[in-house]
Amino acid sequence: MQVSGTIVVILMAANVEAKIYERCDLAKKLEAAGLNGFKGYTIGDWLCMAHYESGFDTSFVNHNPDGSSEYGIFQLNSAWWCYNGVTPSENLCHMDCHELLNRHILDDIMCAKKVVSSESGMSAWDSWNQHCYGYDLSEWLRGCHMNAKPNKKIIS
């Protein structure tokens, strides 16, 4: 009985650092980090992708059939972008995957910028291809009261 209580306390402590962002709060963080217009993508692109990848949840982890895992708000893959101690990794962002699971998303943003700077751009995220590419993304900024302009054009 005491062991299960200890496990609950440990899990609660781990989640204290996690955060599920509100859409407009995340939009403002992304804009402040310079993502609006970065490599031709708007805050709408980033919000749409993050919504479909993680539901804006910084603690989200997805385990893939190939043995790799995806971490954090942008679901950065352990085979390429971070090191999780399990999956052989290129670790192109030079970071531990677990650093992507807290409320402090500047490191996530810096790594996501590397992903977008690669040849694939935002096409690296299947969710962006399926749900965001070619769509009117203005709804993602509706009501956020910020300077970022939504992208209404199709990126080619």
UniProtKB/Swiss-Prot annotation:
Where it sits in the cell: the answer is: Secreted
Origin, by domain of life? Eukaryota
Extract the CDD domains matched here. LYZ_C
GO MF term list: lysozyme activity
The reactions it catalyses are: Hydrolysis of (1->4)-beta-linkages between N-acetylmuramic acid and N-acetyl-D-glucosamine residues in a peptidoglycan and between N-acetyl-D-glucosamine residues in chitodextrins
What is the primary gene name for this protein?
SPACA5
**Gene Ontology terms: cellular component:** acrosomal vesicle; extracellular region; sperm flagellum
* Keyword Signal in record: yes
This one is known as Sperm acrosome-associated protein 5
Q: Which InterPro entries match?
A: Glyco_hydro_22, Glyco_hydro_22_lys, Lysozyme-like_dom_sf
User: What Gene3D superfamilies does UniProt report for this protein, alphabetically?
Assistant: 1.10.530.10
* Cross-referenced SMART domains: LYZ1
